[in-house]
Amino acid sequence: VLAGTRDGAYRSMDFGASWWPAGEGLIERHVRWVAVRASAERRTPADAPSEATPGAFIGTEPAAIYVAEDVQQGWRRCDEVAQLRDRLGWYLPYSPEAGCVRGLAFHGNRGYAAVEQGGLLRSDDGGEHWQLVAGSDGVPRTPTDPTMIHPDVHSVVVHASSPDRVIAPTGGGLYVSDDGGAHWRRLTDRYCRAVWVDPDDADHMVLGPAAGVARDGRIEQSRDGGKTWQPAMDECDAPWPHRMVERFYEIGDELMAVLSDGELITAPLSTLRWHVVLPAVQDVNAIATLGI
């Protein structure tokens, strides 16, 4: 198990019974996102079959991306990300820190990284190197070009059908690209941080929009690619006055949602009838499944 904290990363080899520091090489130590790719997903270029691609990734605040082939050997910073951060003036409205990387998604050797108040990054070599997608200029201001993504990117999903199908919730709405981030369409202009996309049907989505930061949050569903949205909170009081969905996780036949107040709710994907799970556990930030 690999976990990120406000002061580095920690690793457990006994499913959380004991923890050991695993942050060697981290300059920016506030970890906002952790991603681990299985060996089968770590494909190397055909002309370099002996070279290993990174298996673990960390996104930090201030915004930086770190990669590791073996966590025990330490982390390497992708300096091009920090250089973009400093040159373009990435920031967070609630913090003096220079933006943050708060989401990573992979499809084969293609990777995407969500930067809050910075835009969307792309890697074509398994996460070794990163650059802004063509449809994101990296400038933390609302774009005037409707084919550009809003820079306040909260998370990112790449669809199972294609590495070019990318969906990103932002402070300016939900965006989708069919060409790897070169051009974007805004599906809704509502503030959102989380979306789930059906791996078998890219037009089927569950969204957690809100009127603003943790204000009047709700859960909605679309089956037509975002043209229309219907309420998906049969067992909840909507909207929530002071909270919203931070993340969705598909686990088996269930969809789980982490809320901004740290509560964890779940629902069968077939009905989306939500209920609270683990009520005694507070301040949940993220969840992961373990292959036990």
Language-model features: locations:
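Extracellular glycan-interacting surfaces
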Residues: 1-292
